[in-house]
Amino acid sequence: MPLKILVAQINCVVGDVATNASKILSIVDQAKSESVDLVVTPELSLCGYPPEDLLLRPDFLKECHLTLKRIANHISGITLIVGHPHREGHYLYNAASVIQDGQIVARYFKQELPNYRVFDEARYFKAGEQSVVFSVAGVSVGLNICEDVWGEGGREASTESKVIEHPARAVSSVKESGADLLVVMNASPFHSGKDLIRRKVVQTQARLHTLPIVFCNLIGGQDELVFDGGSFSCDRNGEISAQAVFFNESLMTITLDQEQISSEFKERLLDSERATYEALVLGVRDYVEKNSFPGVLIGLSGGIDSALTLAVAVDALGAKRVKAVMMPSQFTASMSREDASTMASGLGVDYSEIEIKPMFDSFMKGLSGEFLGKAFDTTEENLQSRIRGTLLMSLSNKFGSLVLTTGNKSEMSTGYATLYGDMAGGFAVLKDLTKQAVYRLSVYRNTISACIPERIIERPPTAELRADQLDEDSLPSYEILDAIVEHYVEYDRGVDEIVALGYLPEDVKKIVWLIHVNEHKRRQSPPGVRVTARGFGKDWRYPITSKYRGLIDQ
């Protein structure tokens, strides 16, 4: 008899146990009406992922335990797998419970606990040791949780895109226990190219074990992380048999008939620019919605960073929930004002202009005695930025909207940003995009609709904090800068390795030096969407006080 499976690719809110449970039960009721045998939910679906130090609170764990019991009481005539934290004795486990007819008939504890980059599960959980295989409609189903299927090569696959052709021990254990099918519950966060890596990992394990696999992933934004969904299944030969959508909830049905696994869900993978853009949109939307902000504020400069930020915000929230503010100074070019106004008008957002020169002049008058005999320098440049930051935060304070900052990864790497100025805000949309990536995504966004004026994309980047200023007056070309940042930050390559790739030693040394001396700035920056293999968030934990400079004196 065929086994009908519903893969519940859902957006779970961290800490909102009751709402997550209600969503799961609603899906179960729908599945029963469609004669589904088995409902699969993502990793830690009951409490959301990652719950971080909520896992250290006894009251939080108690709520999860009591809610799980209530869910179990509701289940009849169907099998549900739900992810949750579970305390047993002195130990806490990343668990999955199998519920049938009001009873928890099996419970699995995750065996491979990732403890690298954005993951720190060893801080909270003890690794499980036993495989679990249970029966549904005459089919023996095994369970794994996320990293289990990646096995010993999980770190290399996730961070370096190297998939090891080696059987994962948790998968082997399930196969040896007689499983006909493996279900993998996941909370696997997005970065560019991760979808292909996941596929290759799972296909490899399916082929090595001649075992069909169903991969259920979480979707949604959680602070800096975005979970992109893209759940799928593959047959015992590793051939993809079903593919769910990315960046949206999905209830994907799959049928296992003997050894054949089939589905009508055949979504396509997304290209890199589209996937990254949709990650930004989902990250902004969920950060705003889940934290109950009424809308967002953006300082619109007429430059490409704020233009892309505005486009993402409107796509995430709609024009009515976005306000753009242009704050020109005596150094602002007329084309900047024109382009900012044109873009805001085209998108239909609330737009206003506030001249900052009167405020700047007042500050300079007040500081004239202290600054007597001192030439104009970055102090006056940063003062303009801090005036703008103060204005945006005042509007945020008055109306409750969240300020979206517009700085990019190139600027965050080198400290080309002003503390309490353009860094002032609550969420940094472009924080993990290099300047060149900002240009690529802006071009991509204009293929959907031409909302970013071409002149913004074509003109040389400038902060417009002094006369005739260009970014490359202070920094190497972004082509060189971005490449060095990617090698050093994302792939941990050393100075000598990067120089050996053909970059000038002076450029590499300068950029690496800037990366390390600006750690104090990054530590005070708002969270932002992670879209690369390594961002400046949970997966970048360098000390502020440190003399290390990448061995650049050797």
Language-model features: locations:
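ATP/NTP-dependent adenylation/nucleotidyl-transfer catalytic domains that generate, transfer
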Residues: L3, T210-L211, R236, E264-S301, ...
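Enzyme catalytic cores with a strong preference for nitrogen-chemistry domains
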Residues: M1-G299, L310-A319, M326, Y351
